Amino acid sequence: MKWIGWLLLVGLTHVAHATPLKLAAAVEHTAILRPFIHDWFGRAGIDFQLIPCSYARCEKLIEADHAVDGDMARIKGFDQTYPHLLQIGAPISEVAIYGQPRDNPSWPPAKGTVIGCLRGIQWCERFLGNYQVIWLNDEKQGLAQLHRGKVDWLIKMRPASQPALASPWQKITKEQVFLYLDKKHRAEIAALLKVQLVFINNGRWLAMQKQYLSAI
């Protein structure tokens, strides 16, 4: 696995910095994942600061130079869009992808279906290439577009540890979520991977997931 190479390249040095790593943190995940990140980073001796934002605003911060040092929770493949980032080891949680149909509740929909996605939901970019996707600013706008017949489906994402959404929302799939950091933070990445490996081997990683993320 590529992240093991980082351990070999950088070593296993304990890291502590006066300046905390700034992590873009989608507001849907902040309260749930903060304790998990606190335990992980704390054991590695790394300070951090969460920057709450919408999914779309978080991506703007990632694109801006020196605005943040990474993203707290994104699905696999986020580094393909932002190659200066590195996926840090094993998944930390899961997100559920929900869809609300206008008429036909069958998923996947037929070709030509117009799908509305809230801005910043990477899953739509990766898996809906065969459909016409309309990007929406928020759920309120999305529901309005759905009810007016401007879109056939509305897609949203939320932590899988939260209660399932009621009908007419349908759970389409679940995706694993990872921490992503700027590759330039080599020492911090190595320290986090070292701690993660220890936590996985001694069962602490799973225990943290069960403690903080009850659905996993």
Residue ranges and their predicted role:
Residues W3-L12:
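Sec-dependent N-terminal signal peptides
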Residues L12-A18:
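Sec/Tat signal peptide C-region and signal peptidase I cleavage site
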Residues L21-D39, P101-L136, G142-A144, R148, ...:
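Bilobed "Venus flytrap"/periplasmic-binding protein-like clamshell domains
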Residues D39-R43, D103-S106, A110-T113, C117-R119, ...:
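Extended ligand-binding regions for polar small-molecule ligands
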Residues I46, E63-A73, H147-K156:
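Alpha-to-beta junction loops
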Residues Q49-L61, I134-A144:
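Short helix-initiation/N-cap motifs at beta->coil->alpha
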Residues I51-G112, R119-W123, A160-I172:
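Acidic, polar ligand-binding/catalytic clefts
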Residues P91-Y98, P163-L197, N201:
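Periplasmic-binding protein-like
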